């Protein structure tokens, strides 16, 4: 696993073959299906979050350095628009919590600035490892919006934008939170 050192710092990134964004989950599943002839794992289930936690751990302490120009510029823009667009019955955007109210309490937790350098993260409230897209899905449900599918183009773009906001921060995965 030492060969994965630094990988987490640069994801998501452009995949020249598919023309899409690669996340750690897509890299794991591509390896499983194309190299191992195995079935893909579900995006946010135990085996996947265990593997992405192990891979992310190899980059712990290294600074995030996600590229946002060139082939990923369109996805970056889409992610930024998703971050600031109000959705759901509560008409909230990511920015309403993670910019306007970070540091305040929501339920039993402090609102963060929405950084993902600690994902996958172990949540005390559900006693398991949680993926980035699983957290996005949970946020959307909390504001009564219809969430995108984990692994969707929208969530990959949002992951790129949010990861780029953490450029320069150290990878802390796997982390622990309420």
Enumerate the language-model features and the residues they cover.
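Short Cys/His-rich "knuckle" micro-motifs
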Residues: 1-3, 104-108
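Short, flexible, mixed-charge glycine/proline-rich loop motifs
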Residues: 84-88
């Amino acid at each position: 696993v030492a060969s994965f050192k630094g990988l987490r710092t640069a994801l998501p990134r452009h995949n020249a073959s598919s023309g899409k964004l690669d996340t750690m989950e897509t890299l794991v599943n591509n390896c499983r299906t194309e190299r191992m002839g195995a079935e893909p794992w579900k995006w946010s289930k135990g085996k996947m979050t265990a593997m992405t936690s192990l891979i992310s751990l190899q980059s712990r302490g290294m600074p995030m350095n996600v590229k946002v120009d060139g082939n990923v510029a369109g996805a970056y823009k889409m992610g930024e628009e998703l971050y600031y667009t109000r959705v759901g019955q509560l008409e909230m955007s990511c920015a309403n919590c993670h910019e306007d109210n970070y540091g305040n309490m929501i339920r039993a937790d402090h609102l963060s600035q929405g950084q993902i350098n600690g994902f996958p993260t172990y949540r005390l409230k559900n006693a398991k490892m949680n993926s980035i897209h699983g957290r996005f899905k949970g946020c959307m449900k909390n504001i009564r919006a219809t969430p995108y599918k984990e692994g969707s183009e929208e969530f990959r773009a949002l992951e790129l934008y949010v990861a780029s906001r953490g450029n320069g921060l150290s990878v802390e995965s796997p982390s622990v939170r309420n």
